[in-house]
Amino acid sequence: LSLFILFFCTNEITLVMKKIVIFASGSGTNAENIIKYFETKEIGTVVAIFTNNPIAKVIERAKKFHLPIEIFSKAELFESKVLQKLNDFQPDLVVLAGFLLKLPESIIESYPNRIINIHPALLPKYGGKGMYGMNVHKAVVENKEKETGITIHFVNENYDEGNIIFQKKVTVLVTDTPEVVAEKIHELEQKYFPSVIEDLLTSN
């Protein structure tokens, strides 16, 4: 009599959450939106906030979620200190959400195609040094543009010139003020930025 015994092995699959580090300089509304979005997701989580502004409102927002906060000066950004701190968190993706300084090449080269930025216009229009926030919206209105939008792109060594990942347009009415345009852009940022980040984490 031959006895055959079959062993069934169940392999447990452990899902490793991908790590997001956010760089921000201002109020942090986009940062908070991203943090909240990934609280309900299994693909990734925000592990730290980096800022160059010691009085930025993003600091208070980060404290609500008990996240580590790294505050640094412009000079420190171009030293090895910030890169070393960033490496400590081992991020899968670095997200610039209203970060107003240009990243040094040392950071960009350490995280190729893993640093993204959101810009409040349809690049390549209204990009480059000094083109951020209300500066962009004023230029859009002054030039009587019929549409504007957001651009999410990879970061390279030049301002706003990295490969484009995603764009979304919105109509600009002749009666729109820069403040109205800013509100329209903010709505797009809140709606699309987190999901684009999720798509990037899923595809990599």
Labelled PLM ranges:
Residues 8-204:
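One-carbon transfer enzymes
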Residues 1-9:
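Hydrophobic alpha-helical signal peptides and transmembrane signal-/tail-anchor segments
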